[in-house]
Amino acid sequence: MSTLHTVNKSPFERSAFISALNHLRPGDTLLMIEDAVVGARKGSAFAGLLENAVKTCSVYILGPDLAARGMGENDMIQGAKLVDYGGFVELVTSHDRTQAWL
């Protein structure tokens, strides 16, 4: 069973980001939204953890939230993919379950 893990809090403020990473299993998907997108910035304290995650899981970042924080695709770690709101819906419907990390 595939799981979509969504994280909306900055990894610099809450532990939900790390909890989600620790619960990822091969084939799962991580979707970073709202303030969580800052964790996907190249060179951030969390970049190495995410780069390891993309080896066995899919990592997506909500593009409008990234743009709202002054970042673009070139600011993201290697292997993460941008998704729009339609893509967000597609991710939810294509997984067996969704786990929201608050």
Stretches with model-predicted labels:
Residues 69-102:
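C-terminal structural segments of small proteins and small subunits
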Residues 25, 54-55:
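Short conserved AdoMet
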Residues 5-6, 32, 100-101:
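Redox-cofactor binding/interface segments in oxidoreductases and associated redox assembly factors
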Residues 46-54:
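Catalytic-core regions built around general acid/base machinery
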Residues 38-41, 67-71:
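Short, charged/polar "capping" segments at the starts of alpha-helices
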Residues 29-34, 57-65:
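Short internal beta-strands
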Residues 14, 43-47, 82-85:
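Structural motif corresponding to alpha-helix initiation and N-cap regions
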Residues 3-17, 36-42:
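Short, glycine-rich nucleotide/cofactor-binding loops
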